[in-house]
Amino acid sequence: MVGGVPVVTGLAGTGGNACGAAPFVLALPEGAAPALFGPIDSCREVTVRLQPEALVFSTEPLPSEPGEIWVWNPVTGLNEALPEEFAADPAMGWETLPDLALAHPVEAMKLAPVLSALQTGLGPDYPAFAERISDLGSGDLVPGGYLGRACLKFTCDADWAVLYLDASTERVFAIWQVEGEGGPRLWPADRDRWTAAALAVLREIETQ
C-alpha cells in the first residue's frame, strides 16, 4: 500500500545477458482500472525503497556514472528524478583501509583521500580509469595494502583497471588498459615514484 493505493511491483525483461530485468509498478486503485507503470528504462541493478507516499527506485552511484533515481506515487505516476553523483565518504580515511577485505574497488574509492588522489592525479584520464574500475571486478586486502581489479564486461581482456593502495605510505597507484592502445597506462606515470610493494603488483601484471 503506497499513499492509500494497493500496488504490486515486479520485474520484466527480454532475457539474454545484455540487460537484467527492470522493475515495474502495477497500481490497483479502488474503483478504477489497474494501471501499469514502467518497466524502468535501465540496464543496471535497481533497488526499491518503500516510503509512506512513494516508491523510490535507484541504482548505485559509481565512479563512472551517477546513480539513477525514479519515484512513483499515486498522484504523478513514475518519474525520473535527479541523479545521485558518486562521492567519497568524508568520514572514511586511510584508517578504514582494513575494512576493505573482499571489497570491490568501487568501495575503496569511497575513501576520501583515495578518490581525491585519483581525480586530481589522473585529470583527463580519470573517466577512462573510472569506467573500467567500476565494472566487473573484485578486490581484497593483500600484504602491504589493498588490491582491486575490474574490467569492462564485454571486452575484459582489453579494457581493465587495477587499483593498489599502499598502507604504509598512504599512497594510491593506478594501472589501466584501453582497448586499441599499445600498453597499459600508469599513475604515477614515473615508475621511480612507485613504492616497492606497488612495483611488485605492476611486475606481476606485466608478466601475465
Where are these regions (language model features)?
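Short amphipathic beta-strand and strand-loop transition segments with alternating hydrophobic
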Residues: M1, T47-V48, S134-G139
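Short, structured surface segments that line ligand/substrate-binding pockets
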Residues: N17, A33-P34, K153-D157
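Acidic, small-residue rich beta-repeat scaffolds with periodic aromatic anchors
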Residues: E30-D125, D159-Q208
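Intrinsically disordered, low-complexity segments enriched in Gly and acidic/Ser/Thr residues
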Residues: G121-E170
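N-terminal, post-signal-peptide region of Sec/Tat-exported proteins
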Residues: M1-G13, A112-R132
